[in-house]
Design a protein with these regions (language model features):
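Extended beta-strand/beta-hairpin segments
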Residues: 1-23, 35-124
């Protein structure tokens, strides 16, 4: 379930859809790090991902055509507890940056084609 804050036609009962984008990226990063670490023989004792997205609400609220409706940028840090060397972790990061599907979706243009269909009520 997602929601919007009070004042944005929401009840503040769940994360905003944009926060779910960050959660999807964080989850995909963690999973991809674990997969490629195992492939490279790197043992990960613990991993966590912290992300922040910067969004100017003027875009979302259609107050400025020059401001994007979504994130202007996403920054974050992946914290890894491991006996691996710094150079091995840097190589791991390069592989993850290349093969993380959600990161790939966010970094390159993706064709998205959405339609709307009217549902007819049974009483109509």
């Amino acid at each position: 379930m997602s929601d919007q804050p009070h004042g944005f036609n929401g009840q503040n009962q769940g994360p905003k859809p944009s926060e779910l984008v960050l959660a999807a990226l964080a989850a995909c990063q963690e999973t991809t790090y674990r997969i490629y670490a195992e492939d490279m023989g790197i043992n990960i004792d613990a991993i966590s991902v912290e992300l922040t997205g910067t969004q100017d609400l003027r875009g979302f609220m259609a107050l400025s055509e020059e401001v994007p409706a979504g994130f202007a940028n996403i920054t974050g840090t992946v914290f890894i507890q491991s006996e691996a060397s710094k150079s091995d972790l840097e190589l791991l990061q390069k592989r993850v940056d290349k093969y993380c599907p959600v990161l790939d979706d966010l970094k390159r243009p993706v064709d998205v084609n959405l339609t709307v269909e009217k549902l007819i009520r049974e009483s109509e």
